[in-house]
C-alpha cells in the first residue's frame, strides 16, 4: 500500500512539474482589431486579442505577439513593455496617429512590418534592449525638435538597428544628455537605414556615455551624426550631412546642425569628453565639410587624431592620426598610412622612400612620382668616330649617372664622364 501511494505521489509531482513547464513555454499571441469578445481570452497559443496592450498584458516573457491585421492605436500615450517580447508585425502596419510607439522597460524585438507613429517610436530605458530587425520599418512623423524615432537612456540600455528608422523631428535616434541617463549603447548594423527628413534634424544625436558603434548602414541628417560625449567607433557605413552649411554654435539642450556628416562637440557635457575612433566608413556632406571638430561651453582643445581610415568628401587632414595621411582621389579623400608612399596625390607632404619624390602642386596638394633620368648612350656602332645620338633612355635612381660628353681633337673622339648629383 505504501509503495502504491509513493508511486501515485511521484506521478502527481511529475504532472505538476510538467504543467509548470508547459505554462512557461513561449507561445504566440495574436492581435486582430476585428475580433469581438466581452472578456479578453487567457494566455494560450494563438489566442487573439483586439488590442496590442491586451496581448502584452496576457503575455509572459519570451512570448511572441503577432499582428494578423493592420492595427490602429488610439490615444496620445505609449504602449508599455515590461517583459521580454518579440512583436512580429506580419507585414502589417501599426499606426499611432496621436501618440508614440512603445515605452520599453524590458528586451523587445520589432520585426517584419511597419510602425507609424507621431511621437517617439520607442523609448528604451532601465537597462532594456531594443532590436529593430532588418525587415522592420519605423516612421515617426512629428516635426517637433524634442521628438524623433528612437531614444535611449539609463545604464545598460541598448538599441541595435538592422532595419529602417525614419524621423521628422530633432533626431532619428538619440541619447539623453543628463548625468543619470548615460551608460547606453547604440549599434547601427550593416543594412540599416537611419534618416531624418527635417531640414534641421540630426541622424543620430549622442550626448552621453557609453558606446555608439557604427558598423554599417546609411545615416542621413542635416548633420548625420552629432557627438558630445561617450565612446564612438565607426568601422563602416555611410554617413551623410545634407543640411545647409552653418557655423558651429554651442547649444546646451541638443545640437545645432552644421551641414557636416559628423560633428564632434567637446563642450563640458555631463558625460565627459568624447572619445572617437574612425577606422572606416564613408562621410559625405552636400554643402559643408565632411567632418567638424569643435569646442564650446568653455571647453578647450578640439578633438583631433581620431581618424585612421575611411573616405571623405573633403580634406580631413586636421583630424587624422600622426601616422596617417589624406590621399586625394578625384573628388574623394581617403585616409591611408603615411610612409613608403610611391604614387598618388595627397593634401599634405607625404613620406616617400628612396627613389621617389613628392612635388607640391599649385593647389597645395602633393604628387608622388618615381625619380627617373634621361641620358643619350652611343649607338650600337662600335666605331669610335661616330657622333650619332641614340634614343633617350630612362635610368633608375640610385645608380651613378654618367653623361658622355664628346670632345673632338686631332687624335679622334674622347669621352669625359660627368657625374650627375641629385
Would you name each region that the model predicts?
Residues 15-27, 389-398, 417:
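Sec-dependent signal peptide cleavage junction
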Residues 66-97:
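Extracellular beta-sheet-rich ligand-binding/adhesion modules
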Residues 323-326, 355-359:
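Extracellular disulfide-bonded cysteine-rich modules/repeats
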Residues 352-355, 362-394:
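C-terminal low-complexity, Ser/Thr- and acidic/Pro-rich disordered "stalk" regions positioned immediately N-terminal
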Residues 398-419:
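A cross-kingdom C-terminal cell-surface attachment/processing module
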Amino acid at each position: 500500500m505504501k509503495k502504491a501511494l509513493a508511486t501515485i505521489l511521484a506521478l502527481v509531482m511529475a504532472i505538476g512539474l510538467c504543467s509548470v513547464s508547459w505554462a512557461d513555454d513561449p507561445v504566440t499571441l495574436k492581435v486582430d482589431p476585428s475580433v469581438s469578445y466581452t472578456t479578453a481570452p487567457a494566455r494560450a497559443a494563438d489566442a487573439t486579442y483586439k488590442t496590442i496592450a491586451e496581448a502584452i498584458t496576457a503575455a509572459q516573457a519570451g512570448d511572441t505577439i503577432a499582428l494578423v491585421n493592420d492595427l490602429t492605436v488610439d490615444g496620445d500615450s505609449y504602449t508599455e513593455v515590461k517583459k521580454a517580447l518579440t512583436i512580429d508585425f506580419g507585414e502589417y502596419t501599426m499606426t499611432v496617429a496621436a501618440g508614440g510607439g512603445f515605452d520599453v522597460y524590458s528586451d523587445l524585438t520589432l520585426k517584419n512590418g511597419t510602425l507609424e507613429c507621431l511621437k517617439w517610436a520607442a523609448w528604451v530605458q532601465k537597462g532594456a534592449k531594443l532590436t529593430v530587425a532588418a525587415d522592420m520599418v519605423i516612421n515617426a512623423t512629428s516635426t517637433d525638435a524634442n521628438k524623433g524615432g528612437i531614444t535611449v537612456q539609463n545604464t545598460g540600455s541598448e538599441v541595435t538597428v538592422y532595419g529602417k528608422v525614419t524621423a521628422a523631428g530633432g533626431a532619428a535616434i538619440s541619447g539623453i544628455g543628463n548625468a543619470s541617463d548615460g551608460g547606453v549603447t547604440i549599434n547601427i548594423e550593416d543594412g540599416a537605414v537611419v534618416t531624418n527628413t527635417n531640414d534641421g534634424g540630426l541622424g543620430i544625436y549622442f550626448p552621453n556615455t557609453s558606446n555608439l558603434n557604427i558598423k554599417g548602414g546609411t545615416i542621413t541628417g542635416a548633420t548625420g551624426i552629432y557627438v558630445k560625449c561617450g565612446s564612438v567607433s565607426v568601422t563602416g557605413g555611410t554617413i551623410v550631412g545634407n543640411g545647409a552649411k552653418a557655423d558651429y554654435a554651442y547649444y546646451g539642450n541638443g545640437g545645432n546642425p552644421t551641414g557636416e556628416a559628423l560633428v564632434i562637440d567637446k563642450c563640458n557635457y555631463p558625460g565627459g569628453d568624447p572619445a572617437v575612433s574612425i577606422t572606416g566608413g564613408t562621410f559625405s556632406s552636400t554643402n559643408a565639410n565632411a567632418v567638424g571638430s569643435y569646442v564650446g561651453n568653455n571647453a578647450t582643445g578640439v578633438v583631433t587624431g581620431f581618424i585612421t581610415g575611411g573616405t571623405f568628401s573633403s580634406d580631413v587632414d586636421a583630424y587624422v592620426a600622426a601616422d596617417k595621411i589624406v590621399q586625394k582621389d578625384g573628388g574623394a579623400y581617403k585616409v591611408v598610412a603615411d610612409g613608403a608612399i610611391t604614387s598618388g596625390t595627397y593634401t599634405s607632404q607625404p613620406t616617400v622612400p628612396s627613389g621617389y619624390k613628392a612635388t607640391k602642386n599649385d593647389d597645395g596638394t602633393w604628387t608622388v612620382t618615381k625619380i627617373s633620368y634621361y641620358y643619350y648612350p652611343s649607338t650600337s656602332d662600335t666605331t669610335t668616330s661616330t657622333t650619332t645620338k641614340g634614343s633617350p633612355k630612362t635610368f633608375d635612381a640610385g645608380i651613378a649617372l654618367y653623361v658622355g660628353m664628346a670632345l673632338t681633337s686631332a687624335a679622334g673622339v674622347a669621352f669625359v664622364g660627368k657625374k650627375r648629383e641629385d
